A protein has these predicted regions:
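Active-site-flanking beta-strand signature of metal-NTP-handling nucleotidyl enzymes
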Residues: 1-9
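Short, flexible turn/loop "capping" segments at secondary-structure junctions
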Residues: 1-2, 46-49
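Conserved RNP beta-strands of RNA recognition motif
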Residues: 6, 55-57
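Short, surface-exposed ligand-recognition loops at beta-strand->loop->(often short) alpha-helix junctions
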Residues: 9-19
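An amphipathic, aromatic/His-enriched active-site/gating alpha helix that lines ligand/cofactor pockets
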Residues: 28-35, 48-49, 58-97, 105
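Short, solvent-exposed loop/turn elements at beta->coil junctions and helix N-caps
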Residues: 39-45
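Residues on conserved beta-strands of the protein kinase catalytic domain
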Residues: 51-53
Length: 107
């Protein structure tokens, strides 16, 4: 499984529930994604200065991840509206992207 992870803080003045509901509108339109999860820092507990929200998107293959990104770029199903919405809700200075995989690889 390939896990594309985004950490971000919501912009000041933006309601967290509004952010999450808008993120779900975007994520629900990614047809090649296996599943996703949105989590929020609990009680400020963390070992380093990571942003408050974490979004994990799971893809069965790198091709599925690439197809999802192509889906956004091609604006299929007017997905760019929700993607732009994501960028409007988060503090751009805090966005961090990661790509993880299950290890060891499955044959």
């Amino acid at each position: 499984m390939n896990v594309y992870t985004i950490y971000a803080d919501v912009k000041e003045g933006i309601d967290a529930r509004t952010f999450v509901s808008n993120m779900k509108l975007f994520l629900d339109k990614l047809p090649t994604m296996h599943t996703y999860r949105i989590t929020r820092m609990k009680l400020g507990f963390r070992s380093m200065d990571l942003p408050e929200f974490r979004i994990d998107m799971e893809f069965n293959s790198m091709q599925a991840l690439d197809d999802a990104m192509s889906h956004v770029v091609a604006n299929v199903d007017d997905i760019e509206t929700e993607h732009v919405g994501f960028n409007q809700w988060v503090d751009a200075e805090t966005i961090q992207h990661f790509l993880y995989r299950d290890y060891p690889d499955q044959p």
